[in-house]
Amino acid sequence: MKSLIIGGAGFVGAYLVRHLKNDLGQDVVVTKMPRKQVKVDGVDMNSIQVCDLDILQKESIVALFREIRPDYIYHLAAQSSVSVSWKNPALTVDVNVKGGVNILEALRELEDKPRVLFIGSGEEYGHILPGETPIKEGNVPRPGNIYAATKVCQNMLAKIYADAYGLDVMMVRAFNHIGPNQLPLFVVADFCKQVAEIEAGNREPVMKVGNLSAKRDFTDVRDVVRAYALLMKSGCAGETYNIGSGHAIAIEDILKCILDHSSVEIRVEVDPERLRPVDVPIIEADTTKVYEATGWKPEISLEQTIRETLDYWRTKSI
């Protein structure tokens, strides 16, 4: 089997490459933006085909699909930061909505149509009403930020194309996924990086934090990519699947876990610059549907992921 990973140069893409290549023995092709590098620890990069691709150029997508002729396509390319979406909404809409439509339109032009997985986010559900958690796929999305709104739009478009044109397209709503090598744009990586820098003496023993009361559903990225691969085998076209742990935890509890693993005393300060204009109070997944389709459930504990992420940033701070 041959898998094409669109946007494989990022955090999740690297883990997906490793899983598909090393664990499943698939042929893997990765796309990246021009001038961006792809390096996956533990994978012989000579065995991976890497191609430049701008998903805002539809004809380039069509040409690549016809050249590669993949069996499976994982669409990971996205502007995936909520904070960046507030600062640059136009870019977020272009990449997440226009880019998604370009891929769907390119699929329509192919004679041999591959199976495709569009990656969305638990942020799509937005403002959850009392009694709606854990969140099922049938919950009405009420996106609370620009990033989430673009992913809702992408999900709806993918569903319409699957139904109208018979495309073998599935969608996931992946809740917060974390692990070593994640950019510090995201909360766990940010906290771990700050702690590691403090331990190394590279900054004052003060942590800057945002909203600590928000509750989120965290899953190790290695479990997440395993779910993606299982859905390629067993998921149903036109369907959306939640990927998460099924348990929400307050950000303040995440912070406590990280600080418990630290070797120094650290003071915590709320930084107004880190507070979002709107923040969803709780996001927690119901993962019954993906379990029934694939048998998937997370295997790596949150404590293990946090410990390994902190150790990763310690090596970067030496």
Regions found by a protein language model. Name each.
Residues F191, S234-L275:
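Mid/C-terminal beta-alpha module of Rossmann-like enzyme folds, strongest
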Residues I55-V95:
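NAD(P)H-binding glycine-rich loop region in Rossmannoid oxidoreductase-like domains
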Residues V43, V221, T240, E273-K297, ...:
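Conserved C-terminal active-site "lid" loop/helix of NAD(P)H-dependent oxidoreductases
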Residues I6, K87, N176-Q182, P205-R216, ...:
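Glycine-rich Rossmann NAD(P)(H)-binding loop
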Residues S3-D23:
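N-terminal Rossmann NAD(P)H-binding glycine-rich loop of SDR-like oxidoreductase domains
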Residues I128-P134, M156-D217, V221-L230, G246-A248, ...:
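NAD(P)-dependent short-chain dehydrogenase/reductase
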Residues K87-E105, R115, E123-M171:
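Catalytic helix-loop patch of NAD(P)-dependent Rossmann-fold dehydrogenases
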Residues L302-I318:
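Amphipathic terminal alpha-helices
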